[in-house]
Amino acid sequence: MKIAVLPGDGIGTEIVAEAVKVLNALDLKLEMETALVGGAAYEAFGHPLPDATLKLAKEADAVLFGAVGDWKYDKLDRPLRPEQAILGLRKNLGLFANFRPAICYEQLVDASSLKPELIAGLDILIIRELTGDIYFGQPRGRRTATDGHFPGAEEAFDTMRYSRPEIERIAHVAFQAARKRSKRVTSVDKANVLETFQFWRDVLTEVGQQYPDVELDHMYVDNAAMQLVRAPKKFDVVVTGNLFGDILSDEAAMLTGSIGMLPSASLNASSQGLYEPSHGSAPDIAGKGVANPLATILSAAMMLRFSLNQEVAAQRIEAAVKDVLVQGLRTADIFSTGTTRVSTVEMGAAVVKALK
C-alpha cells in the first residue's frame, strides 16, 4: 500500500507529521514517500506541483495532503500560486467526489456556537461534486459587454454547466454512501432559477429510482443553508454541486465548533483518493506548535477506509481520537475551562498511545 505524503505549507508539515506517526503505529505494511507541494515546491522548483510530485501522486494508492498557501504568494501569477497544486491534483487524478463529514463529538458540544440540543449527536456527510460546475465551466473571462444592462461596459463572466455522466456518477456515490448510513439523501440545488440545476434535479431523481431503499429529497440551496443552522440533525447525506458544496461544507464544519476537527476525502472512480484536513495552511500559527492535528489524523483514517480497505485500522484511529477527547486533552482551538491544553506534538503522541 503506497501513500504519497504531501505536507505542503504552513501548519501542513506539523499536522501531517503527527498523522504519519499514527499510521506508523498501526503496524501495517505502508510505503510512505514524501514530496514537496504548494509554496514549498514553488520555492524549490518554481512550480507548486512539480512533475515529480504529480508522478508520485499518480503512482500511489492514496495521497495524504496537509495544506497549501501563504499570503506572500498572493501576487504571483495564478498558475504559480500554491493553491493551484490542489486543483492540479484533483484534475490529474480525476478526483470527482469530495466527502466532508461534519461530526460533533460529545465532548465538544459546548464548542459549537449553536445550542447543545441542536448539535449533540450531529453526523452529516456532505458529498460535493469536484470537477464540474461554474469553477471549471468554459467559456469564462472578461470582455466588453454587447448586451445586458450596460452595453459597452467591461464585464466578467463564468459558465455553470454539468453533463449527465458527471451528475450520474456523483449521484451513485451519494446513494451508495447513504446505504451504509441511515439511507437518506438530500440533494441541494437551485432548480427554481438555474437550468443547470433543474437538470441536476432531474438526473438525481432518475438515479434515485435505482435505489428504492434510499429516501431522496430535494432542497433549494438557500433553504439548505438556513436549515443547517436551524435543524442540522435533519440531514444525513447531502449531495450537491461544486459551488454550493464548497459553501455548505464550510458552514457545516463550523457547526461542530472547530474546523480543526474535520477531515475530508476526494476520490476518483477507482477509489484512489486524496485525504486532507478541511482547514487551510494557517501561516499565522505555523511553527508555534499549537495547530490541531486531529483533522489530519482523521483524514488518515478515511484514507485507510476508502482507498486502502483497512476498516479495522480506520476504526482504531477514530476510537483513539475519541479517547483523547474523553481524557480532556485539547489543542488551542478547542480548549475550554476544565480541559488540558496540549501542543500539536503532544496531541499526536496521545493518539498514538490511545490506539487499541
From Swiss-Prot:
SMART domains in UniProt: Iso_dh (SM01329)
Ligand binding (Mg(2+)): 222, 246, 250
Cofactor binding comment, as recorded: Binds 1 Mg(2+) or Mn(2+) ion per subunit.
Site (described: Important for catalysis): 135, 190
Catalysed conversion reaction: (2R,3S)-3-isopropylmalate + NAD(+) = 4-methyl-2-oxopentanoate + CO2 + NADH
Gene Ontology biological process: L-leucine biosynthetic process
Main location: cytoplasm
Similarity annotation: Belongs to the isocitrate and isopropylmalate dehydrogenases family. LeuB type 1 subfamily.
Protein name (database record): 3-isopropylmalate dehydrogenase
Organism listed in the record: Albidiferax ferrireducens (strain ATCC BAA-621 / DSM 15236 / T118)
Gene: leuB
